[in-house]
Amino acid sequence: MRNKICKELNNTDIGKLVNLCGWVDRRRDHGGVIFIDLRDHSGFLQITINPDDGADLFKQAETLRNETVIMVSGIINERPKDSINTNLSTGELELKVKDLQVLNQIKNNLPFPVSIHDYENTKEELRLKYRYLDLRRGKLLENLKTRHKIIKVSREFLDNFGFTEVETPLLTKSTPEGARDFLVPARLSNGEFFALPQSPQLFKQLLMVGGLDKYYQIAKCFRDEDLRADRQPEFTQLDIEMSFVSEEEIISFNESLIKKIWKEVLNINFNNAFPRMSWQAAMDNYGTDRPDTRYEMLLKDLGGVLGDIGFNIFTKAIKAGGYIKSITVKGGNSSISNVRIKPGGDIFQVAQDAGAGGLAFIRVKGDELETIGAIKNNLSEEHIADILKITEAKDGDLILLGAGDKQIVNQSLDRVRQYIAKDLNLIDKSKWNFLWVTDFPMFERNEDENRYEALHHPFCSPKNIKSKDSDKMQKEIENSIANAYDLVLNGMELGGGSLRIHEANLQREVLKTVGLTDKEIDEKFGFLIEALEMGAPPHGGIAFGLDRITMLLIGADSIRETIAFPKNQQAKCLLTNAPSNVSESQLKELDIEITIDE
């Protein structure tokens, strides 16, 4: 049907007969000549039709609506000098049409303009409902091509190092991994269910037990969790696993992979090794294990200075084992008013939404500290000197303080730090600040359920477990550091991994630590325990979020911009109206009865 696409055309094609196919992006009638911007997947070309080309052809061109699918044949000409479009690669050319065929008419009015000339801020819900039209706008297609390039570069890199791509099952066993599973009823086993995998974690470990040595997969994963801009119920991981490797070898190898992706996609070189930071240092200084290191405002611990000054909120926090922490906003006295950090203010609200009761503040004015009387009246000169030394605050700076539960203080000041950095334009958006976060605790305590939860997952190997006695081992495990690592970029987690447990006894003890009984372990993970007893090699790996990597590389705000047909924030596909009801006969086949609570 066609012998060229738009972007292939150049000055060497002048005078040649070409066939092109595409959409009418825009039609204009100037002085009896019809100009049509023809759009295909590669770009644009102006085509011209005038009455001298034939009455029928001209009449047909007059009726063309935007987005009509056409095929045209004609001669490539050089545009007149005064009509050259320097914004297009084909802006010096035009096609003088000899023949035009309509391949498909527009039946209905379009729900939104597709032409880049008419591009408007279309609501995302409408874009998702008519995703095929949104794709035609070009930007999404470019995003998908970038995604494809990332996958292509990754495959080539891993193939060159002897990795084997293996597909693991999508219908698998429901196991407790953190988020809710998507369940699939098994018709041939009434009352039983498959689960869609939250990750290929256990299967890739079993591949290592099977001797594969080096594995990767572009893996579809599914998690039934609350959504946000960087989450979808189904998402894609670049999943990697290796045998007989150390933590250092895994980090070094995967750092090279990430550098290769950035080089091939953005032509950016990173010559130095990515910096590293322990989990504890990240929490102490940033309040999060995903720190954005492009700007300062580090958290500072003021518990030793302010815990005993007699201010009730501070006293209670320290007595309860909590924190008093601060961030310093340089020049904050002039850029942030009291209204914004008091109840009803936007910064106060950010802290409150993160669980804090509020914010205290201190303004540095010369050698004096300005704050509420209950704090200021109890500050000695020594207190003031210590505060200024720890916070590194100078004249004109604003110190914001949080006090209370450790987790809430860290979380609220982290959110406030991010909010202020964006608000005051403190972030250098040209920077790519990669960071390896290492030495995660194996577990965190769930006080509500009176048990431990794995910070990553219960298949991470703990460091320095020496005891073989079950009771002593259990105590060591509870307080251990994991052989785990995350790669963070500009405050977002790109991927995470660990060395895995390859000894059956240790794996059983770790699963007991998260609250499983021996019976539950055998029911849920018996196949894994049995495999580890049959000569499992030391192994480890990592999984990168492909959607998130693509989002960062294209500069998008949501991973929905990297996926051809994403779900909305209610986990619905607006294009197909999924999920939807199914017929009674389908439910009957599965012996499923639906009851809905009023």
Curated annotation (Swiss-Prot):
GO terms for cellular component: cytoplasm. ATP binds at R223, D224, E225, Q232, E493, G545, L546, D547, R548. It is an enzyme of class 6 (ligase). GO terms for molecular function: aspartate-tRNA ligase activity; aspartate-tRNA(Asn) ligase activity; ATP binding; nucleic acid binding. It is found in: Cytoplasm. It comes from the Bacteria. The record marks H30 as: Important for tRNA non-discrimination. L-aspartate binds at E177, R223, H456, R500. Transmembrane segments: none annotated. Its main location: cytoplasm. InterPro entries: Aa-tRNA-synt_II (IPR004364), aa-tRNA-synth_II (IPR006195), aa-tRNA-synth_II/BPL/LPL (IPR045864), Asp-tRNA-ligase_1 (IPR004524), Asp-tRNA-ligase_1_N (IPR047089), Asp/Asn-tRNA-synth_IIb (IPR002312), AspRS_core (IPR047090), GAD-like_sf (IPR004115). Homodimer. Aspartyl-tRNA synthetase with relaxed tRNA specificity since it is able to aspartylate not only its cognate tRNA(Asp) but also tRNA(Asn). Reaction proceeds in two steps: L-aspartate is first activated by ATP to form Asp-AMP and then transferred to the acceptor end of tRNA(Asp/Asn). Belongs to the class-II aminoacyl-tRNA synthetase family. Type 1 subfamily. PANTHER family: ASPARTATE--TRNA LIGASE, MITOCHONDRIAL, ASPARTYL/LYSYL-TRNA SYNTHETASE. NCBIfam families: aspS_bact, PRK00476.1. This is Aspartate--tRNA(Asp/Asn) ligase. The lineage of its organism: Bacteria, Bacillati, Cyanobacteriota, Cyanophyceae, Synechococcales.
